[in-house]
From Swiss-Prot:
Gene3D superfamilies, A to Z: 3.30.70.330, c-terminal domain of poly(a) binding protein
Entry's localization field: Cytoplasm; Nucleus
Entry function: Binds the poly(A) tail of mRNA. Appears to be an important mediator of the multiple roles of the poly(A) tail in mRNA biogenesis, stability and translation. In the nucleus, involved in both mRNA cleavage and polyadenylation. Is also required for efficient mRNA export to the cytoplasm. Acts in concert with a poly(A)-specific nuclease (PAN) to affect poly(A) tail shortening, which may occur concomitantly with either nucleocytoplasmic mRNA transport or translational initiation.
InterPro entries: Nucleotide-bd_a/b_plait_sf, PABP-dom, PABP_1234, PABP_HYD_C, PABP_RRM1, RBD_domain_sf, RRM2_I_PABPs, RRM_dom
Protein name (record): Polyadenylate-binding protein, cytoplasmic and nuclear
PROSITE patterns: PABC, RRM
Cellular-component GO terms for this entry: cytoplasmic stress granule; post-mRNA release spliceosomal complex; ribosome
Keywords assigned by UniProt, alphabetized: Cytoplasm, mRNA processing, mRNA transport, Nucleus, Repeat, RNA-binding, Translation regulation, Transport
Keyword flag Nucleus: yes
Transmembrane segments: none
Species this chain originates from: Scheffersomyces stipitis (strain ATCC 58785 / CBS 6054 / NBRC 10063 / NRRL Y-11545) (Yeast)
Length: 632
C-alpha cells in the first residue's frame, strides 16, 4: 500500500464511528427502540433495510477494523465497522459487523466477498438478524450430516443455493479447523428448506450418501431422548464370531421380527471386527431379541445384545458407574485403611503385616515399591473393623521399628490431604494477622544463621584455629545433594551473604576437616569424592533431633526455598515468611518441602499476609517528629 493510500485510509477511518455498530445484544435494543408501538412487524424490516448491516464471521483474531474497512470500502460507502471483542481481555471473538448506507452495497458485498479469504481464512458473510426470534426459529433451517471432509462453507452454499435464498450456511469444524462432517443451511423460507430436503436427502456428495432433514434444537432433542430411549428399535451386538457375515447375522435375528437394516463393522481389509447393529421395524421385536439373545453362546462364545447407545450416552453411563464404584470403595474402606510411612528399606509386605497382626484381622497389607522393586518407604494396612484400626494407630504411631519411628494414620486421598493443609494454613494466616494487629508486628520471624565472610569463599578458620566443628545443623548441606561445588555451599542469602544448609552425612566430616586450608584459598572439594554416599532422610533427621532443634532444621530447609522464589524482595520478607510457615506442624512442613505445588500455594498465602501487614503498617498515622533543639 502506497503512502497516499495509507493516508486516505487513515482519514476515512477517522470519519467512521468504529464503535457505532452494536453487538448482537445491543442491536436488539436499537431495533426495539427504533420501531414505533403497533408497527413492529413492518418497521423492524425497514430498520434492517435502512442500516444494511452485515455479519462477518470466521475471522482470525488478528483481523481489526482497519483490515475490514480496506476490504469492504471498495464495494460502497461504509457507515460503521465493529469487531466484537471480549469484554475483559479485549481479544477478538472472531466476528464483526459492517454497516453500509445502501442496501445495494450490502447485497453486492455478500455476492462478491462471501467466502473470500481474509488473512488466509475464508470469511462467512450474511445479513445481520437483529430479531432473536428469527435467529432461533427452526423454520427454514436444515441439518446435513455425513458430509465429505473436503466440503467447506462455500461448497455447501453452492450446492444448496439452487433451492432458495440462503440466510446462513456453515460446516461445523473442530479446534484445528477440520470438518466435523456435518453442517447447517438456513433458508429464507420454509418452502426452500422442504425442497432441499426432498431433493438432496440420500444423494451422493463426493461419493458419500448424505442425510438432510429439518434442524431440531438441542433442547427439543434432549426432551425427546427419553421417549426414543423407551421405544428403541436399534440394537447393538458385540463379541460376534469373526467368521460371521451380515447374512449369518440376519438369519440369527430375523425370527424375532422384521428387520429394516443390518450393519457389521469391518476393517480396511474387509474382515469383521466382531460387532454390528440390527435395526427392527418395531420396538417389541427389538426387546424380544435382546431378551432372547443376550449372553447366548454362539460358536463357543457368548454374545452381547443390548440397546444401541450414542457415544455421549455411553460415556455418561461409564462415568456414573466409575463414580459409584469409587464411592462404594471409599465407604467400604472408611476408617479401616491405615497409611504407614518412614518404613525401613528392608521392610516388605509380609513383615509389615506381621508387625500389625496383633491388633486385629488384616484384609490386606502392602508396601509400595518403585519400578525396580525397591521400597518407597511407605505402605498400607487394611483391617476388618474401625476399632482394630484405631487400636493399631494408638499403639504403633511413633513406635520405633527397625530403628525408625513409624508414622501411622488413617489413609486419605491426596486431594483431601491437600485441602486440609490449605484450610489449616489459611486459618493460621488469619490468626497471625489478628495477632499482628494486636501486637503491632508479625510474630515468629525466622533469622537464618549466616556467615559474614568474603563472598565466594568458605568462612575462614584462621591460622592455628580449630577446624570447623562436627556435623552441625548450621554447617551442613541440603539433603540429597553431594558435597561439592561453589554453587552448592554456601548458598546466597540476603545481600549476598552465604547461608548454611543441611544434610552432610557424618562420614563426610573427616574429608571436610582435611580440606579447610584448600577452602580458605578458594578451592572446593571434588564433586565426585562423596558420590554414592547416602544422605539421611529429612523425616528421620527431624524425628531424631531434639525438639528445640527441629524447627531450626526445617527453617534452614524452608528459607532458601523461599528466597529462590524471588518474590520475597524486602530484606526481612524471607525471614518473616519462614517464621509464618514454621508455625505449621512438622509433618505439614515436610509435605510442603516434598510437594512444590503445595509449597507454592502456602507461600503465596503467607506472602499475601505479609504484604497486607506491611500495607496496614504503612497506612498507620505517624507521630510528628519533635523539633530539633538549637545547637550552641
Amino acid at each position: 500500500m502506497s503512502a497516499a493510500d495509507a493516508n486516505q485510509l487513515q482519514e476515512s477511518l477517522e470519519k467512521l464511528n468504529l464503535d457505532s455498530a452494536p453487538a448482537a445484544a445491543e442491536e436488539e435494543a436499537v431495533a426495539a427502540e427504533s420501531a414505533p408501538a403497533g408497527e413492529e412487524g413492518a418497521d423492524s424490516a425497514n430498520v434492517a433495510e435502512s442500516t444494511a448491516s452485515l455479519y462477518v464471521g470466521e475471522l482470525n483474531t488478528s483481523v481489526n477494523e482497519a483490515t475490514l474497512f480496506e476490504i469492504f470500502s471498495p464495494i460502497g460507502q461504509v457507515s460503521s465497522i465493529r469487531v466484537c471483542r471480549d469484554a475483559v481481555s479485549k481479544k477478538s471473538l472472531g466476528y464483526a459487523y459492517v454497516n453500509y448506507h445502501k442496501m445495494e452495497d450490502g447485497e453486492k458485498a455478500i455476492e462478491e466477498l462471501n467466502y473470500s479469504p481474509i488473512e488466509g481464512r475464508p470469511c462467512r458473510i450474511m445479513w445481520s438478524q437483529r430479531d432473536p426470534s428469527a435467529r432461533r426459529s427452526g423454520d427454514g433451517n436444515i441439518f446435513i450430516k455425513n458430509l465429505h471432509p473436503a466440503i467447506d462453507n462455500k461448497a455447501l452454499h453452492d450446492t444448496f443455493s439452487t433451492f432458495g435464498k440462503i440466510l446462513s450456511c456453515k460446516v461445523a469444524t473442530d479446534d484445528m479447523g477440520q470438518s466435523k462432517c456435518f453442517g447447517f443451511v438456513h433458508y429464507e423460507t420454509a418452502e426452500a428448506a422442504e425442497a432441499a430436503i426432498e431433493n438432496v436427502n440420500g444423494m451422493l456428495l463426493n461419493d458419500r450418501e448424505v442425510f438432510v432433514g429439518k434442524h431440531i434444537s438441542k433442547k427439543d432433542r434432549e426432551s425427546k431422548f427419553e421417549e426414543i430411549k423407551a421405544n428403541f428399535t436399534n440394537i447393538y451386538v458385540k463379541n460376534i464370531d469373526l467368521e460371521y457375515s451380515e447374512e449369518d447375522l440376519k438369519k440369527l435375528f430375523t425370527p424375532y421380527g422384521a428387520i429394516t437394516s443390518i450393519y457389521l463393522e469391518k476393517d480396511a481389509e474387509g474382515k469383521s471386527k466382531g460387532f454390528g447393529f440390527v435395526n427392527y421395524e418395531g420396538h417389541e421385536a427389538a426387546v424380544k431379541a435382546v431378551e432372547e439373545l443376550n449372553d447366548k453362546e454362539i460358536n463357543g462364545q457368548k454374545i452381547y445384545v443390548g440397546r444401541a447407545q450414542k457415544k455421549r450416552e455411553r460415556m455418561e453411563e461409564l462415568k456414573k458407574q466409575y463414580e459409584n464404584t469409587r464411592l462404594e470403595k471409599l465407604s467400604k474402606y472408611q476408617g479401616v485403611n491405615l497409611f504407614i510411612k518412614n518404613l525401613d528399606d528392608t521392610i516388605d509386605s509380609e513383615k509389615l503385616e506381621e508387625e500389625f497382626k496383633p491388633f486385629g484381622t488384616i484384609t490386606s497389607a502392602r508396601v509400595m515399591v518403585d519400578e525396580t522393586g525397591k521400597s518407597k518407604g511407605f505402605g498400607f494396612v487394611c483391617f476388618s473393623s474401625p476399632e482394630e484400626a484405631t487400636k493399631a494407630i494408638t499403639e504403633m504411631n511413633q513406635r520405633m521399628f527397625f530403628g525408625k519411628p513409624l508414622y501411622v494414620a488413617l489413609a486419605q486421598r491426596k486431594d483431601v490431604r491437600r485441602s486440609q493443609l490449605e484450610q489449616q494454613i489459611q486459618a493460621r494466616n488469619q490468626m497471625r494477622m489478628q495477632n499482628a494487629a494486636a501486637t503491632g508486628g508479625i510474630p515468629g520471624q525466622f533469622i537464618p544463621p549466616m556467615f559474614y565472610g568474603q563472598q565466594g569463599f568458605f568462612p575462614p578458620n584462621g591460622r592455628g584455629n580449630a577446624p570447623f566443628p562436627g556435623p552441625n545443623p548450621q554447617m551442613i548441606m541440603r539433603r540429597g545433594q553431594p558435597f561439592g561445588g561453589p554453587e552448592q555451599w554456601p548458598r546466597p542469602g540476603p545481600n549476598g551473604q552465604p547461608v548454611p544448609v543441611y544434610g552432610i552425612p557424618p562420614q563426610a566430616y573427616s574429608d571436610f576437616n582435611g580440606q579447610n586450608i584448600r577452602q580458605q584459598r578458594g578451592y572446593y572439594p571434588n564433586r565426585n569424592q562423596n558420590k554414592g554416599r547416602q544422605q539421611r532422610d529429612l523425616a528421620a533427621i527431624i524425628a531424631s533431633a531434639p525438639p528445640d532443634q527441629q524447627k531450626r532444621i526445617l527453617g534452614e530447609e524452608l528459607y532458601p526455598k523461599i528466597v529462590a522464589t524471588g518474590k520475597a524482595q524486602e530484606p526481612e520478607a524471607a525471614g518473616k515468611i519462614t517464621g509464618m510457615m514454621l508455625d505449621l506442624d512438622n509433618q505439614e512442613i515436610l509435605a510442603l518441602l516434598e510437594d512444590d505445588e503445595l509449597f507454592t500455594n502456602h507461600f503465596e498465602d503467607a506472602l499475601t499476609a505479609f504484604e497486607e501487614y506491611k500495607n496496614s503498617e504503612a497506612a498507620a498515622p505517624v507521630a510528628p517528629a519533635a523539633p530539633a533543639e538549637p545547637q550552641a
